[in-house]
Every structure is written in C-alpha cells, then in structure tokens.
Amino acid sequence: MAQVNMRDLLKAGAHFGHQTRYWNPKMSKYIFGARNKIHIINLEHTLPALNDALAVIEKMVASNNKILFVGTKRAASKIVKEEARRAGQPFVNHRWLGGMLTNFKTIRVSIKRLRELEAMHEDGTFEKLTKKEVLMATREQDKLERSVGGIKDMGGLPDALFVVDVDHERIAINEANKLGIPVIGVVDTNSNPDGVDYVIPGNDDSIRAIQIYAQAVADVCVRAKDNSASEFVEVTETNENEAAAE
C-alpha cells in the first residue's frame, strides 16, 4: 500500500467521530465541528499524527524492536491479526488478560504450555490419547491460542504498543504506562487520550478506517525489516570483498 493520504482517510470515514453527547472534552483540539449531532474529526490533525507515529514505528522496527498490535473488539480483531502477522509482529486480538505485560512471568507459563500442546499435536502424541483426552487437550490448545497465540514468539516485553480503540484497551494501556512502554493509539472523539504517547485522532469503529491504520503500520514494519536486511547484506558483502582484497 502506498503512503496514506487525505482521500484514503475520507473514503474510509476516518473523520466520523461519535455522537456529540458522548464526546470527551480532552479530544476537543482534534474536532473540526459537528454534523447531524456527530462530531467530525479534523483530518488535518489525523494525517500528520499518523505519519509521525509511522516514522516512530519504522525507526523502532529497523532497530529490531517489537511492536505489539492490540485490537480485541469485533471490528478490529481480524484486521489486527492479519496485519500483525504480515508485519511479523506480535498481537492480541481477543480478550486482554490482566497482567499480560505487568505479570509477564505468568504469561510465559501459558505460552510454554501452548508450545507443549503444539508439539504433542505434531509428534503424534495425540494419537496415543483417548478421545476424551484429545478433546480436552484440543480445547485447551484452542483457548491458549486465542489468548496468547499472538505473543508466543514475542520473546519478552514489547518495545511499543499499537492500539485500536484506547478506551476498549485501557487495561493494556495502563500496564504499558506502568512499565514505560510507549503507546501509539487510534483515539476517537469519545475516548480519553491520557496515557497515549502518540495520539492518532480518528474513527476507531469503521472497519475500513481500522484497515487503513493497521495496514499502514504493517507496511512500515515490513519496509523497515526489508531495509535492515538489505543493509546487512551490503555490509556482509563489503566485509567479504575487503577480506578477499587482503
């Protein structure tokens, strides 16, 4: 996908906020006005905020840092999973487990158990179990896959969070804040921007708008990784050539 422009955001309805009676006054500086009792987000703020966030993410990924994609509500869940996977980044797209960051040691236990079940499934151990045991093990594996499957390869705490709907994911943001992990978040007119280091003012309910944000983040992650890989190849080739010359 090419760089996001104003037309993309307009077509996706990124400028449509919530009903005026549900607004959060802390978002007033990002609001252009109201139409039919719906707040209109000023995309003149959204586009540069998105680009600033993308620049930060690209720089972090180029340094081999991990960006945790978080979007657990129905409109965001599938998109977050698909784009995070494409980006090669961890994700949480079902319920956020309390302590997922602040009590990561406990989460590691769940990840270890998931890996054990995956290994059992692959090495034929399931075939030696009774039907009831297979059913119970499969259910456990499915449950763990939903809750920690997206972070099983994270290896440790993430370096930043990319969040869709900051009110819905407030527990995740609070945990990140406690640990000093920067938060990049899509913030709608009814939401509280507190605790979000990089605010992207925009509609967080429209599937098309969520797709644009997540796709843009994934794109810069992929680009940063590709650039890092090509730089590594160039350095390696240069070193080999210098060694051959000697």
Curated annotation (Swiss-Prot):
Keywords: Ribonucleoprotein, Ribosomal protein. Signal peptide: none annotated. GO terms for cellular component: cytosolic small ribosomal subunit. One of its GO terms (molecular function) is structural constituent of ribosome. One of its GO terms (biological process) is translation. Pfam families: Ribosomal_S2. NCBIfam families: rpsB_bact. Belongs to the universal ribosomal protein uS2 family. This is Small ribosomal subunit protein uS2. The gene is rpsB.
